[in-house]
């Protein structure tokens, strides 16, 4: 042994734990220690330090040995391996004063050694280790023994400390099996070679500890042994769940351990550990716990012991006492496991007492944010219970139904209190994470109310609306209590979407209180936000009772003056909902509506989504105006209002102006979308439409569209970068093109075509190609799309640098996807155009489309594949020979690409598309396709070397049939070498 290396390692350990090193020096020292561990002297360093009297040296020695075991065990001889086992066992058995830190690390090292040894040497070591630790008989490690002989001679243990050491070792062994790096190596070998041989002995040890040491907890080692046994129970549960094996088939004796664990729950010294253990067991193995044990646990939880712990759970969280929610875990775990029994026996005292405990947990003090876990975790149980009960047979039993409703209604009442917002000052003091957490919890409480509505119905409306009426009549409540009643109503209105006389009557009572106006008087932002949500939820009611609109919308517009984005967004969504639902009732208010919008626009240009909602809202109202000239006059006012904001001098810098510009364009896009015609029949005959259609000849339409084009041109010229605005401009144009009948935003086809051609060459953007596709599919103006127009559009595309350069073509995925979509439409609408006017370009994009098949970019592959299908199937009776020549030219490379995909070069998701293309080729020319398939599959090793020529011959026969999906799947699996894997044997299809 090199004494210098040992001394150097000892100094490094001393320096590392001395607390005198800087962070950089600590990193350097750790690096030096790792180098020493990896060296040839690492084994000697570990063994030498393990015998030291210094705690940190002992710990480092065990750590070094564990590292060497995990990475370099093969460097030890069989004799050295046995000696290493003995030395680790000696450390545990002969050193009574071993510090807990060192003891745990030595046990971890021993567990790692056991697993590695049994995997590589295929010899049992865990049985011997358990026997030596339990019986304190080190000399028996070299003896021949099996599971039967160990069981016959194992009991009793030498001492409670030996029992504790054994349980600690079992726990670490199971943890290593579950989480160590070796689980990836061979999970089946770990289960069969390590766990299974000693599993019954493990259970026997645990049964002995639970049975004997729970009787006398005055001894510290007895308590320690019980705690380790409980840790083992959690570890076994975790490992069996991870290994996906049945307790009943693999470890039936584990049931006895679970039963005995219940006895520990009432033992103060190990109660919390036992509760956590049982919560874990109930989550995974509740069906294996015997009924007598379940009854015993039920009695404990609902008896004096449970009541005491419930009171502890409900203590003030600011009292300074730690609470790890062990009682909550066990109660929730037990209640979830017993859910069917609770429902079936809801009238029994034990069920009622358990449910009242769970209801009480919703009264946990404090706000339900991240730090408050009690109410949060209880909520999910109640939501599930209410839903399950409402669908059970018990709900049809009047006595059971009445008992359950009494308990559940108390939960609903507690939910109201739990939803209460804090004061504005406290709310603003919370970090955003806490506010988000609270809002998330409120949404979960809303789910509870929705579930409760299925059993309570009108009773919930009565409770919340009566509470609101009393609030306004008494005048003594807080804004928070009013807000939470609004919120609860929102929740159940989302659930109850059906109109009914009962609902109508209750909402009439609600609106008769003028709640919106009275709520706005508090000037409480959160109250106004929830009030706006409630108005939105009542949109269908307001559609049938428009008299309440004039006292609702003004409140919402006033709320937009609150300079808080989240509130503005909520309010704008509510305005949008009311305007889309009740537009026809708001025509008389249009002038006031417009005035408010004009006033708010300068303040809202900084919040694009809000401004868009407001503009599209007024757009929906104007769309209901039958007089086209009057309608256009309001649209002109909106456009002029937007134009007034586009003055750079109004803003501190150009960057802010650029954002305002985009906000304004987004708002105009919202107006454009709002102008969708609502009539069932178009005002023009789509089939007979001509350039002379009177719609565009109306002076008001022509004037508005001239103004719109001027606005778009002006916006382009003022943008710092065209790329920032092109998407919004195209969105405005597309909104007009997508209508069944033209709207004021439906620019003439020739205008949009000219815009496309002028812009695409210098700025090839995907959204421009989307515009091109919209032009081709527009239901009117198609007579304007003559060959010259198509030539102009295709020439703009052909001359684009992005299209010419193959690398750019492949890298700009969004452009390429839209390009193939555009050309697919041309093939459908104008079948012979591409081959006649652009034969070389057509061949180019076809070849590139073939190359894209099998690519991982799914959207790109799909677009290219659909283009190929459109090309093959397009009808070209006037150019049949030319089309046949084109298809024949691509047939061979296309089939080769398809076969490569079938042969494993494409992902599973590509197989349906490739199969579809092959089907179209067969339909177009079966004999030519068969010849290409035959020639390709005769090539040696093509498309994969994993399949024989005989398999390929059978596959060729299969491909020539009508139904090929199953055969393609089988061939793909064989080529990928997956036939023996679970994935290959699974039942997936396409």
From Swiss-Prot:
The keyword Nucleus applies. GO terms for molecular function: GTP binding; nuclear import signal receptor activity. Its main location: nucleus. One of its GO terms (cellular component) is nuclear periphery. Keywords: Nucleus, Transport. It comes from the Eukaryota. It is found in: Nucleus. Pfam families: Importin_rep_3. Signal peptide: none annotated. One of its GO terms (biological process) is protein import into nucleus. The keyword NAD does not apply. Functions as a component of the nuclear pore complex (NPC). NPC components, collectively referred to as nucleoporins (NUPs), can play the role of both NPC structural components and of docking or interaction partners for transiently associated nuclear transport factors. Active directional transport is assured by both, a Phe-Gly (FG) repeat affinity gradient for these transport factors across the NPC and a transport cofactor concentration gradient across the nuclear envelope. Belongs to the importin beta family. This is Importin beta-like protein kap111. The gene is kap111.
């Amino acid at each position: 042994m090199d004494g210098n290396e040992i001394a150097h390692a000892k100094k490094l350990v001393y320096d590392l734990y001395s607390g005198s090193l800087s962070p950089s020096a600590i990193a350097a020292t750790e690096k030096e220690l790792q180098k020493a561990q990896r060296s040839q002297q690492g084994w000697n360093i570990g063994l030498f330090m393990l015998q030291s009297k210094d705690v940190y040296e002992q710990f480092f020695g065990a750590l070094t040995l564990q590292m060497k075991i995990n990475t370099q065990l093969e460097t030890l001889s069989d004799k050295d391996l046995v000696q290493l086992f003995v030395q680790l066992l000696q450390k545990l058995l002969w050193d009574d004063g071993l510090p807990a830190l060192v003891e745990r690390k030595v046990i971890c090292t021993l567990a790692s050694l056991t697993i590695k040894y049994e995997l590589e040497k295929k010899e049992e070591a865990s049985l011997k280790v358990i026997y030596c630790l339990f019986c304190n008989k080190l000399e028996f490690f070299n003896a021949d023994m099996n599971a039967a002989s160990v069981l016959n001679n194992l009991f009793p243990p030498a001492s409670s400390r030996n029992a504790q050491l054994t349980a600690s070792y079992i726990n670490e062994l199971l943890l290593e099996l579950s989480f160590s790096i070796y689980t990836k190596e061979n999970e089946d070998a770990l289960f069969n070679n390590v766990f299974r041989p000693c599993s019954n002995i493990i259970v026997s040890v645990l049964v002995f500890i639970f049975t004997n040491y729970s009787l006398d907890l005055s001894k510290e080692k007895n308590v320690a042994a019980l705690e380790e046994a409980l840790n083992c129970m959690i570890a076994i549960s975790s490992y069996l769940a991870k290994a996906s094996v049945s307790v009943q088939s693999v470890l039936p004796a584990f049931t006895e351990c679970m039963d005995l664990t219940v006895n520990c729950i009432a033992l103060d010294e190990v109660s919390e550990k036992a509760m956590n253990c049982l919560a874990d067991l109930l989550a995974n193995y509740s069906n294996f716990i015997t009924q007598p044990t379940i009854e015993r646990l039920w009695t404990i939880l609902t008896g004096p012991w449970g009541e005491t712990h419930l009171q502890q759970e409900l203590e003030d969280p600011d009292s300074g006492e730690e609470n790890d929610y062990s009682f909550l875990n066990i109660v929730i775990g037990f209640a979830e496991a017993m859910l069917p029994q609770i429902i079936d026996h809801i009238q029994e005292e034990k069920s009622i007492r358990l449910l009242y405990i769970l209801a009480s947990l919703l009264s946990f003090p404090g706000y339900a944010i991240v730090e408050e876990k009690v109410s949060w975790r209880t909520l999910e149980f109640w939501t599930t219970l209410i839903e399950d009960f409402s669908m059970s047979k018990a709900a049809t039993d009047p006595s059971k139904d009445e008992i359950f409703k009494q308990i559940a209604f108390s939960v609903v009442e507690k939910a109201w209190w739990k939803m209460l917002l804090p004061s504005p000052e406290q709310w603003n003091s919370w970090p955003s994470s806490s506010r988000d957490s609270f809002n998330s919890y409120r949404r979960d409480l809303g789910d509870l109310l929705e579930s409760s509505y299925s059993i309570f119905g009108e009773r919930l409306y009565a409770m919340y609306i009566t509470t609101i009426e009393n609030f306004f009549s008494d005048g003594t409540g807080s804004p928070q209590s009013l807000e939470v009643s609004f919120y609860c109503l929102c929740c159940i209105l989302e659930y109850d979407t059906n109109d009914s006389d009962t609902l109508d009557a209750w909402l009439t009572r609600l609106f008769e209180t003028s709640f919106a106006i009275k709520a706005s008087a508090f000037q409480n932002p959160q109250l106004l936000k929830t009030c706006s949500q409630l108005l939105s939820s009542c949109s269908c009611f307001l559609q049938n009772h428009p008299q309440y609109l004039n006292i609702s919308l003004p409140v919402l517009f006033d709320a937009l003056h609150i300079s808080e984005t989240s509130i503005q967004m909520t309010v704008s969504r509510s305005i949008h909902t009311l305007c889309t639902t009740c537009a026809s009732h708001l025509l008389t208010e249009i002038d006031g509506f417009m005035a408010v919008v004009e006033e708010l626009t300068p303040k809202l240009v900084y919040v694009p989504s809000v401004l868009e909602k407001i503009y599209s809202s007024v757009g929906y109202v104007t769309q209901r105006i039958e007089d086209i000239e009057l309608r256009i006059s309001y649209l002109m006012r909106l456009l002029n209002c937007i134009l007034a904001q586009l003055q750079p001098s109004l803003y501190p810098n150009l960057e802010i102006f650029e954002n305002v510009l985009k906000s304004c364009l987004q708002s105009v896009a919202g107006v454009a979308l709002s102008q969708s015609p609502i009539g069932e029949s178009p005002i023009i005959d789509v089939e007979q439409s001509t350039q002379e259609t009177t719609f565009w000849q109306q002076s008001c339409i022509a004037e508005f569209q001239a103004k719109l084009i001027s606005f778009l041109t002006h916006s382009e010229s003022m943008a710092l970068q065209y790329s920032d605005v092109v998407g919004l401009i195209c969105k405005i144009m597309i909104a007009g093109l997508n209508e069944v009948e033209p709207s004021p935003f439906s620019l003439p086809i020739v205008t949009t075509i000219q815009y496309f051609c002028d812009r695409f060459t210098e700025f090839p953007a995907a959204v421009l190609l989307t515009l091109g596709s919209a032009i081709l599919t527009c239901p009117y103006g198609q007579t304007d799309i003559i060959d010259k127009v198509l030539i102009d559009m295709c020439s703009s595309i052909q001359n684009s640098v992005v299209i010419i350069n193959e690398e750019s073509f492949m890298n700009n995925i969004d452009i390429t996807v839209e390009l193939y979509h555009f050309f697919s439409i041309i093939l459908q609408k104008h079948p012979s155009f591409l081959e006649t006017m652009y034969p070389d370009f057509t061949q180019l994009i076809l070849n590139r489309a073939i190359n894209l098949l099998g690519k991982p970019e799914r959207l790109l592959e799909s677009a290219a594949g659909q283009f190929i299908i459109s090309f093959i199937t397009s009808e070209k009776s006037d150019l049949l020979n030319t089309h046949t020549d084109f298809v024949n030219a691509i047939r061979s490379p296309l089939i080769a690409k398809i076969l490569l995909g079938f042969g494993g070069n494409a992902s599973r998701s590509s197989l349906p598309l490739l199969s579809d293309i092959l089907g179209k080729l067969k339909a177009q020319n079966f004999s030519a396709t068969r010849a290409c398939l035959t020639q390709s599959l005769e090539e040696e090793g093509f498309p994969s070397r994993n399949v024989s020529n005989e398999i390929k011959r059978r596959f060729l026969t299969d491909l020539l049939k009508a139904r090929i999906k199953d055969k393609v799947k089988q061939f793909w699996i064989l080529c990928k070498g997956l036939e023996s894997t679970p994935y290959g044997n699974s039942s997936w299809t396409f």
